[in-house]
A protein has these predicted regions:
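A cross-family "folded-core" feature that marks the main globular domain of proteins
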Residues: 1-192
Length: 192
């Protein structure tokens, strides 16, 4: 099935539905045709039908460059940090990055109230967020604030630990509250 000029849905040799990405891969293709191997840039083998459906829907409306950036960030995380990530990261991170790029182009920057805690409790994931912010700047010339690296880090926490994004936010929030109580009791001011 052709999703757009750059994305097609197909079945691999085992009968598993896959989503295939490549520049112009869907252009002038007909249903049932074999996908030209030389045009394949990435194959998404998603075991969950619901995630596969969300991914196809997301990829259909997103610029290929943004999908490629997201995929590169995920590949970097798996390779350099040796992270085992839930497949939902392809949907959640790609969607987040696309929305963040749109916001930043309009000059809208969201403050990440948990940035300090994210840096302290999830340093590896925060470094991935920094890598993502730098990659977006390099490829698309879109400046993203450091706060965005923190938001991106939470997507990796979620995918790494198999939790809901709300759970990934809950821990640093609780730590922030605990540190506030300790600071109040000791009569000290805590900073970075």
């Amino acid at each position: 099935k052709i999703i757009n000029n750059n994305i097609v849905s197909a079945f691999d040799e085992t009968g598993l539905e896959v989503v295939i990405m490549g520049r112009g891969i869907g252009f002038q293709m007909k249903r049932g045709q074999k996908v030209p191997v030389e045009k394949v840039e990435k194959i998404f083998r998603i075991k969950s039908q619901s995630i596969a459906g969300q991914l196809k829907e997301l990829l259909a409306k997103m610029p290929l460059e943004q999908v490629q950036i997201s995929n590169e960030i995920i590949s970097y995380a798996k390779k350099t940090m040796k992270l085992k990530l839930n497949q939902s990261i392809y949907v959640t991170l790609t969607d987040h990055i696309s929305f963040a790029i749109s916001r930043c182009k309009k000059g809208i920057h969201l403050e990440n109230a948990l940035l300090w805690e994210i840096k302290r409790f999830y340093p590896q994931e925060f470094e991935l967020g920094r890598y993502a912010v730098e990659l977006v700047k390099k490829r698309l010339d879109v400046e993203m604030p450091e706060d965005e690296a923190g938001f991106i880090a939470l997507h990796f926490v979620n995918a790494e630990y198999g939790t809901d994004i709300r759970d990934a936010v809950r821990f640093p929030n609780q730590m922030k509250e605990i540190l506030g109580i300790v600071a109040d009791e000791l009569g000290i001011e805590m900073d970075e």
